[in-house]
Amino acid sequence: MDKLKKHEQICKELNSLYCRKNADYGDSFGKSYEEFGPVIAAIRMGDKLNRYKALIKGRQQVNDESVRDTLIDLANYAVMTVVEMDMQSGGDAE
């Protein structure tokens, strides 16, 4: 598989995970973003980045999340933040 196809596959995976989590938890990120603004995105992504750093340094204490899982979550938080920014501005970045 070439890198363009792999990127497309990962983006589909991101969307699938986003849909499943929204079905389970509702739009909790959107509600938090509405209440606290961009700072909530920085906090959530900061938590994931700290988790990533702990994993790559071998300091993991919980075995149920891999480096890949953490990076997927981090990517989804970045996309969700762009969605909230676009929704607030009433625009679509396309």
Task: Outline where the language-model segments fall.
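Intrinsically disordered, low-complexity regulatory regions
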Residues: M1-E94
